Amino acid sequence: MRREGMAGVAARLLGALCLAACLPPALGRDAGAQWTLEKYSHQPRILGSDAIQKVVASTDISEMWENDLRPILIERYPGSQGSYIVRQHIKHRLQTLKAGWEIEEDTFQRYTPYGYKTFSNVIGTLEPSAKRHLVLACHYDSKFFGQQWQGRVFVGATDSAVPCAMMLELARALDNELQLIKASSTSRPDLSLQLIFFDGEEAFVRWSPSDSLYGSQHLAQKMASTPHPPGSTTTNQLQGIDLFVLLDLIGARNPVFPNYFPNTLRWFQRLQAIEQKLHNMSLLKNHPVQSQYFHSTLHRGLVEDDHVPFLLRGVPVLHLIPSPFPAVWHTMKDTEENLDKATIDNLNKILQVFVLEYLNL
């Protein structure tokens, strides 16, 4: 991702983003396309204290650390052996769960400053036939630094090994609840969960429209041209996304997450409410009242990240990236040693409650 800026191209892009953030996707002529509007009136099923206690008891930061985070903390720039290893790890972890994830590997080639490179996004979907999907997304690639660091390896702990591990831990911890998605029920909307792990978020040399966001640009374009539900002539996979939740730069102590987009404010406020509820129940670690993660401030700067290709196509976005960025951003100090386990554990709990509430489980 690139830091916020307001000049030149960035300002023009920000205007386009703001316009896209305020407009729903265009509907087709088919009256059946009205289902694409259901996301705007969707209501969560608020969890009570007993259900929240159950979520907290199911998640395990130590298990996540050993089984998901550490295997990802390797050099994994696009096309590297580490990239292949991490991709296989992600697929294996989802395939071992009972919920029944369907795994797609979206592989393609793009020209980069180092010639043509192969990229592979990993998409895990529960019930692809469901009309609507809540999407959680992150990028699994690490930034390519070449030889400039005298043999040292950049592992991108916050950027974005931790978000990847958090998403895998969510799938594991909520495995029993997520199995209910396949059970037909008149009390639940036709709604499911999709996890997207992007390749090629980072620039190889210098951030530009042609050297960044390789995976998300490709997948957004592909989804926009893929009919959904299958056989539809009026709606596509992008219109099937209820909410696109992007996690990035997570893992440092005391992060501050502002609200980036007014059209998803109510979902940001759910995160605030969940954080406050867990705090009041004494379920968050090292979380004094003044250390609130989710702040009501509307962030008016620009952060270019994997959400941009989706936002520009009208997809509602909830961007979970702290501002300011962690001090270790794009340095060799972005390592396991500089992560804060309590913060990550707290955010796991908040995100897992949010997902269950959104899915009405």
Task: Give the role of each language-model region.
Residues R2-L361:
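Secretory-pathway/membrane protein signature
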